[in-house]
UniProtKB/Swiss-Prot annotation:
Keyword Aminoacyl-tRNA synthetase belongs to the record: no
Lineage, opening ranks: Bacteria, Bacillati, Bacillota, Bacilli, Bacillales
Role summary: An accessory protein needed during the final step in the assembly of 30S ribosomal subunit, possibly for assembly of the head region. Essential for efficient processing of 16S rRNA. May be needed both before and after RbfA during the maturation of 16S rRNA. It has affinity for free ribosomal 30S subunits but not for 70S ribosomes.
Record remark on domains: The PRC barrel domain binds ribosomal protein uS19.
Protein name from the UniProt record: Ribosome maturation factor RimM
HAMAP family named in the record: Ribosome_mat_RimM
Keyword rRNA processing: yes
Highest taxon above the source species: Bacteria
A single MF term (Gene Ontology): ribosome binding
Origin species: Bacillus pumilus (strain SAFR-032)
């Protein structure tokens, strides 16, 4: 079976002269994902096999996560990592509390209203602030934006990839 990967960040630049890299994070759990000793894989365009690295340090600076890796010790080595993607093996994801889900579990789910009519399929998740917003693609209609809040999202069944919502007035344009 082929290995499945999940994107957790992108190396956008170096920071300092000791091999530290600047990362735009794509994970909801940077403190877990980038903790010292965590194993990540660096995917560089045009490079066959990913480079396995171990996090040596992590700190936040402005809107970036700054990382060093045990295997990278100089600015010159870090320069080569620019524009690379950081990934983790899907099988090494941490467990979540009840009612919490990874984005990849939600994207692709079919959404049904209270009459069990198909609304559409979740194609993207936006994170604008207080709560996530699910972008639901609908056949022949504009995408619907569904807030992930208890008064709207009533039931999530990851095993069957279905989600049931209560459509509040004005939530979905016809």
């Amino acid at each position: 079976m082929e290995q499945e990967w999940l994107n957790v960040g992108k190396i956008v630049n170096t920071h300092g002269v000791r091999g530290e890299v600047r990362v735009v994070s794509k994970t909801d759990f940077p403190e877990e994902r980038y903790k010292k000793g965590s194993v990540l894989y660096i995917f560089k365009q045009g490079q066959g096999e990913p480079l396995k690295v171990t996090v040596a340090s992590h700190r936040q600076h402005k809107q970036f996560d700054l990382l060093t890796f045990e295997e990278i010790s100089s600015l010159n080595e870090a320069e080569l990592l620019k524009e690379s993607i950081l990934k983790v093996e899907k099988e090494h994801l941490g467990s979540l509390d009840e009612g919490e889900f990874y984005f990849h579990q939600i994207i692709g789910c079919e959404v049904y209203d209270e009459e069990n009519q198909l609304v559409g399929q979740i194609k993207e998740i936006l994170t604008p602030g207080a709560n996530d917003v699910w972008v639901v693609g609908r056949k022949g209609k504009k995408d619907a934006l569904i807030p992930y809040i208890p008064s709207v999202v009533k039931k999530i069944d990851i095993s069957s990839k279905t989600i049931h919502i209560e459509v509040m007035e004005g939530l979905i344009d016809e």
